[in-house]
């Protein structure tokens, strides 16, 4: 067995021993030893391999697999620009704390700076965006290297999981490989062996960070539950503004009701980023703000946080009048939103979000586009407790959302996955629908596209003010006029153009026997009236 083949075999074996079950691979020559080893492990049923031809979408596929599967997922590619294409996925994984492993093949280091083909200084390419950058030395005919290879894999997985730091995230694992890059026809020599019984070479215990924080519940308190939050039993029963991807600790409070409530105290869990009404409360110097997190960072955009911890030690009792006021105002806001939706003459993204949220049932998995869809979902309904909700809210870009949805659906076998996206988000990553014949495909993924022919979110921002109407449509609205049906046909994906009523019917229909695969349900919406619709809701409050 030649050195590069031996090294790749040991690395893949140790990844499996370390708990890796899904791997995404992009074709290339320099990463051929890893490709051969991964294919062998896939055929043996030790892991599931996903082939993709585009490293950018492959990175987000791995991200979706990691988020939904709650395990590290390696994305393997050749050297050069192939590695650089992982930049957007690495950024998202960093800020969302997702255990993504970028496993890049490299040229031997002596080739750097020589003008050799497809050779760049890729070690350290991701800088501070990764938890660790780990490289292996060139493989030699030395049996003693086996322990170094396996030990390095264990370090990679520990860093990705945040085992010792409490801060999961992406890791760059760079492996320089020297020719020959294919297995010997007549392999000689032993296969590098791991620990007996399939154990990992190095085991690590997950470190726990326990920082108690005193919290008096007597002042009128609102909980702000943001993306990445853990469920906080000690906050049960408190009024909570929860983003769709975050747990609801207590009584749900509609985000549009918050300006009327005037809390005296706010407790942040996770990282809230969706609502301006929340940002205003957290920036109010008259509000005492506390932050509970599960890692070393805490959110504090305004610099207003008084104290942080990993758990609250509560004292005092919340005022029942405050609790009742929060409940009443929230229920009134919910009704106002639904009333305005019913009165609005045309379908908008809010209408589509309402139809989707109403059709979900226990066991469903929902993935929301990071632009308007996640905000629309937050305004029309809070997901039921037994619905899993995901969104790329680490950096909140629209990149790779189709691929992330495919990955999430592949990792979630317990039920169906529904993704709610805007048209620009869908078009930005339409190549995520490209799945090779024979590759694993989602069992049941429905992608709902609210198509308003452009960037609806800007209608609600300062740029959407009527005084900028002469500039808005071209540089912010960005109409495209794309035929989504033709696009889906090119990818051999089922497509239906539906109205709101048919959307609800199709989402609520009993599941047909067998695998449904991927389907796209497109709803034509309008964005020109979004500003007025939101204003009408606020007027009712």
From Swiss-Prot:
Binds 1 thiamine pyrophosphate per subunit. SUPFAM superfamilies: Thiamin diphosphate-binding fold (THDP-binding). Its cofactor is Mg(2+); Mn(2+); thiamine diphosphate. Keywords: Magnesium, Manganese, Menaquinone biosynthesis, Metal-binding, Thiamine pyrophosphate, Transferase. Pfam families: TPP_enzyme_C (PF02775), TPP_enzyme_N (PF02776). Its EC number is 2.2.1.9. Catalyzes the thiamine diphosphate-dependent decarboxylation of 2-oxoglutarate and the subsequent addition of the resulting succinic semialdehyde-thiamine pyrophosphate anion to isochorismate to yield 2-succinyl-5-enolpyruvyl-6-hydroxy-3-cyclohexene-1-carboxylate (SEPHCHC). This is 2-succinyl-5-enolpyruvyl-6-hydroxy-3-cyclohexene-1-carboxylate synthase.
